Amino acid sequence: VLFRSAQVGKVWLVSYIGNFVGCLILSVIFVLAGASGTADYYAGFIGNKLSIPAGEMFFRAILCNFFVCLAVACGMKCKNEVAKFFMIILCIAGFVVAGFEHCVANMATFVTAALLVPGGISLTAALKSMVIVTIGNAIGGGVLLAWPLRMMSADK
């Protein structure tokens, strides 16, 4: 069990770092393409995003990754490609419209804001947000969805 936990931790760490590198590259391309909007928009947006109370941020993150993992589960269960597409879009749109927090989406948002508004983003506040949201995402996906699904299929 300890070995499996270490393997999961290693996969999560590599995935997290890989996602950050991908967000960094895409944010640079996004900014260089001029597709990122204005610096004024990002300055206000980031200020609001980083001022969300920690408890609220945590629960938004739990709900967010519940939706993300639900999208993955629906995608695996649907046999028809069109049905998969619409189920995934519906689940993802649910968390986006609700304004929930996802650590990978926040990585891209924070990097883009840092590139557009140099000095306009607090590294401490961004790191605090990332820790809270990452923990919430792990609970939302792992405890609220993956674990119950695993328990339901354990006898099979």
Regions found by a protein language model. Give the residues of each.
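Alpha-helical transmembrane segments in multipass membrane proteins, preferentially the mid-helix core
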Residues: 66-77
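Internal alpha-helical transmembrane segments of multi-pass membrane proteins
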Residues: 79-94
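Membrane-interface interhelical connector segments
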Residues: 32-57
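Alpha-helical transmembrane segments and their lipid-water interface positions
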Residues: 22-30, 68, 105, 140-145
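Short, small-residue-biased leader/transition segments that mark boundaries at the very start
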Residues: 1-2
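Transmembrane helix-loop junctions in multipass membrane proteins, especially transporters and channels
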Residues: 31-39, 77-81, 118, 149, ...
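C-terminal transmembrane helix-loop-helix hairpin of multi-pass membrane proteins
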Residues: 95-150, 154-155
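Alpha-helical transmembrane segments of multi-pass membrane proteins
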Residues: 10-18, 22, 132, 136
